[in-house]
Amino acid sequence: MLTSIRHNYRLSAIITPTTAAQADTLNAGPSFGDFVAPDAPLSPAEAYEIKTVQVGPEGRKKTITRLPEWLKTPIPSNANYKKIKKDLRGLNLHTVCEEAKCPNISDCWGGSDKSAATATIMLGGDTCTRGCRFCSVKTSKAPPPLDPHEPENTAEALSRWGLGYVVLTIVDRDDLADGGARHAMETIMKIKQKAPSMLVEALVGDYAGDAEMVKLVANSGLDVFAHNVETTEALTPYVRDRRANFKQSLNVLRIAKETKPELITKTSIMLGLGETEDELWKALKDLRANDVDVVTFGQYMRPTKKHMAVHEYVTPDVFEMWRQRALDMGFLYCASGPLVRSSYKAGEAFIENVIKKRRMGRGGQVGGAQIAEMEKSA
């Protein structure tokens, strides 16, 4: 009898009726459908409509915004996705895809063949010394020491996957005298030793403005030097860590280009942070003045409630407008869309084509017809 009473007590403790406030909270949270694209395409009017829902107890309800339809993505699956994840765990490697909660992980990791799959390896560990208000990567003033095996393990993993184009993201390491530049250089050199034909893009920090460290990475053998300005100059103090500034980022990109002119230089800007049209125009002009080749635009998506709020969800039409404006200004390539991120597969395919054509001696600049042709293949 005592056993029965205890059993019933446990059940009653577990099966507790949901209160109205709890039900509201659950109903307003992400549903299964929030992460899965709908089967039937919506009309533009339906797709672009921002939906809201009221949550909270009576008398204290508040309105929150639902995720727009154009930001919904498939759940990660497929054999390539599982293989990449297994290899990463086995070699104790990290990816920005996971750490930054990228919405494109199912698309990039789940490519139908090896050449289509992409994973962005994060070097320097999984902890950054900067605390930008948009970023979900862990942060600390004193992160763990660098893993001396990371360069070799990274090169080994990438050689297993047989990819044609890889992306490395290096966390800021202000705790190190060289900012982690030599670690990045060693990794790139080992990748090129194991796979000479593999194209390497490295997304690096600003190395606190140290030009010698920028030159070190630029001369390491990489093909694409990426450094993100992230937002407009006016918003930089509110969005990025206080040690970062817009002009310093421009200098990093300029120094890399001057060090090795054949390098493709690349940067990314988030939209939806409250930037104005004039601020964006100025940012693009400044980037072109510093000979930046590639720019990408993507929607800022708030990782957690601790991060800065989304000011607006920018529609696909506006992203397309900025893509065309960037191309008209002379950028070699522009990927622009709500789900575009700095490491974006279609952009990588395009850049890969450009580098191969340059290696074959077909000229450094790409005309409008070539751009259209290569965008189709990407």
UniProtKB/Swiss-Prot annotation:
Q: Which family does it belong to?
A: Belongs to the radical SAM superfamily. Lipoyl synthase family.
Q: Which keywords describe this protein according to UniProt?
A: 4Fe-4S, Iron, Iron-sulfur, Metal-binding, Mitochondrion, S-adenosyl-L-methionine, Transferase
Q: Give the catalytic activity.
A: [[Fe-S] cluster scaffold protein carrying a second [4Fe-4S](2+) cluster] + N(6)-octanoyl-L-lysyl-[protein] + 2 oxidized [2Fe-2S]-[ferredoxin] + 2 S-adenosyl-L-methionine + 4 H(+) = [[Fe-S] cluster scaffold protein] + N(6)-[(R)-dihydrolipoyl]-L-lysyl-[protein] + 4 Fe(3+) + 2 hydrogen sulfide + 2 5'-deoxyadenosine + 2 L-methionine + 2 reduced [2Fe-2S]-[ferredoxin]
Other remarks in the entry = This protein may be expected to contain an N-terminal transit peptide but none has been predicted.
Q: List, separated by semicolons, the cofactors it needs.
A: [4Fe-4S] cluster
Any GO BP: lipoate biosynthetic process
Task: Give the Radical SAM core domain ranges.
Answer: 111-332
Q: What is this protein called?
A: Lipoyl synthase, mitochondrial
Main EC class of this protein? transferase
The record's InterPro entries line, in alphabetical order, gives:
Aldolase_TIM, Elp3/MiaA/NifB-like_rSAM, LIAS_N, Lipoyl_synth, rSAM
Q: Where are the transmembrane segments?
A: none
Keyword Chloroplast present in the record's keywords: the answer is: no
A Pfam entry, by short name: Radical_SAM
Supply one GO CC term from the record.
mitochondrion
Q: Where does [4Fe-4S] cluster 2 bind?
A: C128, C132, C135
What is the superkingdom listed in this entry's lineage? Answer: Eukaryota
Q: How is the cofactor bound?
A: Binds 2 [4Fe-4S] clusters per subunit. One cluster is coordinated with 3 cysteines and an exchangeable S-adenosyl-L-methionine.
Extract one GO molecular function annotation from the record. metal ion binding
Indicate where this protein resides in the cell.
Mitochondrion
Q: Does the keyword Transferase apply?
A: yes
Q: What is its EC number?
A: 2.8.1.8
Q: In which pathway does it act?
A: Protein modification; protein lipoylation via endogenous pathway; protein N(6)-(lipoyl)lysine from octanoyl-[acyl-carrier-protein]: step 2/2
